[in-house]
UniProtKB/Swiss-Prot annotation:
It comes from Vibrio cholerae serotype O1 (strain ATCC 39315 / El Tor Inaba N16961). CDD domains: PPase_ThiI, RHOD, THUMP_ThiI. It holds the Pfam family ThiI. It catalyses: [ThiI sulfur-carrier protein]-S-sulfanyl-L-cysteine + a uridine in tRNA + 2 reduced [2Fe-2S]-[ferredoxin] + ATP + H(+) = [ThiI sulfur-carrier protein]-L-cysteine + a 4-thiouridine in tRNA + 2 oxidized [2Fe-2S]-[ferredoxin] + AMP + diphosphate; [ThiS sulfur-carrier protein]-C-terminal Gly-Gly-AMP + S-sulfanyl-L-cysteinyl-[cysteine desulfurase] + AH2 = [ThiS sulfur-carrier protein]-C-terminal-Gly-aminoethanethioate + L-cysteinyl-[cysteine desulfurase] + A + AMP + 2 H(+). It is found in: Cytoplasm. InterPro entries: Rhodanese-like_dom, Rhodanese-like_dom_sf, Rossmann-like_a/b/a_fold, ThiI_AANH, ThiI_fer, ThiI_N, THII_Thiazole_biosynth_dom, THUMP_dom. This is tRNA sulfurtransferase. The gene is thiI. GO terms for biological process: thiamine biosynthetic process; thiamine diphosphate biosynthetic process; thiazole biosynthetic process; tRNA 4-thiouridine biosynthesis. It comes from the Bacteria. The active site is at C457. One of its GO terms (cellular component) is cytosol. Catalyzes the ATP-dependent transfer of a sulfur to tRNA to produce 4-thiouridine in position 8 of tRNAs, which functions as a near-UV photosensor. Also catalyzes the transfer of sulfur to the sulfur carrier protein ThiS, forming ThiS-thiocarboxylate. This is a step in the synthesis of thiazole, in the thiamine biosynthesis pathway. The sulfur is donated as persulfide by IscS. GO terms for molecular function: ATP binding; CCA tRNA nucleotidyltransferase activity; tRNA binding; tRNA-uracil-4 sulfurtransferase activity.
Amino acid sequence: MKFIVKPHPEIFVKSESVRKRFTKILESNIRIIVKARTQGVAVFNRRDHIEVTSNSDTYYAEVLEILTTTPGIQQVLEVQQSSFTDLHNIYEQVLELNRANLENKTFVVRAKRRGKHDFTSIELERYVGGGLNQAIASAKVKLINPDVTVQVEVVDELLNQVIARHKGLGGFPLGTQEDVLSLISGGFDSGVSSYLHIKRGSKVHYCFFNLGGPAHEIGVKQTAYYLWQKYGSSAKVRFIAIDFAPVVAEILEKIDDGQMGVVLKRMFMRTAGMVAEKFGIQALVTGEALGQVSSQTLTNLRHIDNVTDTLILRPLINWDKEDIIRLAREIGTEDFAKTMPEFCGVISKSPTVKAVKEKLEEEEAKFDFALLDQVVYNARQIDIRDIGKESLEKAPEVELVNSAEEGNAVVLDIRSPDEEDESPLEIVGVEVKHLPFYKLATQFGDLDQSKTYLLYCSRGVMSRLQALYLQEQGFNNVKVYRP
């Protein structure tokens, strides 16, 4: 197994020193994730590309997923490796692989060579190119701007040929930009805005203002954990949960109805700014889009920004909602967002779309700002890698079982449809049902509640989180299946 990783082109327009630093960080990021999720896979930095190789194809699918979801990669070339006897044997193998693709096309052969051979790279290109030109009557050699470039690499006694090209995420390697703190709610907007900053190379830490109790926090943790695991697991990031119920209660009691929405957002930004300063984070990220709700007019956004010196980034400011949802679908956060309740919109019945500074300050004079210090002091922060462990510690009643032999038990495979199709779960003598995790909130109650359900996922994190969530909803017939 061999992959050639092409870094994003923006990296190569940097100065030589910056380019080297970025590619070194990209190499390190790939190595960290590969080491955590595979065995026997090596990563090499080759100046203008990175090679990922193994003597086995065991982790082919896992490595390909890693490379196509790691920021900073433009393209992943899949390479077929084979042995060869001589120059003519190389030509025969190249012809076999490329014949169909070269019909009625112009082409050029580009070769690279490492090791001791009785031919040069130029001789290899000419021999293979001439042979292809003779063997495929409709093909024609064209050295400049051909339809197809046939890439051939010879390393010692191995022939490497590109057999597939996979699109990468683009962007910059994670950690090449400064850290940001994302105000995550679990909805469409905050998930997409977090992803965009991961893609651009920032380590994204998560700040969650809890307005909806334990079930809401569990749902948001699932979203944050998914984003980290899928796109940013080379980085150590924090998840900070703040119980904002006391602040909301104070607003409901003391603030004029029309000002509540803007005041709440100002309290969010004040508090998040305090958290960012505590951890040395340079900017806040929100999912706000211009005009999407009443608090997101230019006037209101300006008043919201003015309460903190911390930079506020809004990557979705000019996005249409359907574009946000489409990207959420592409990156895998849509299903989380669809089942996430919205709490912010209920606190103001007649929100102002054009707040006045003096009126806001008059209303906020009634507010006990000591509450903000209190909620920051009481905030809980965890390493995002420990979300699975925390869910287990906080819910010891969620039983883990490694056998599905209970007579009344059904194994409930909660993986996504793609995962289930790729690796179906089959257990002899045991009923297995498939219900994706994102449908549990709405469809678990429709199942036969006289049975016990053993929740299964690949790594055991999502199943524990979902079991905890279901128990919060009053379902006590759930366990976690870890064979």
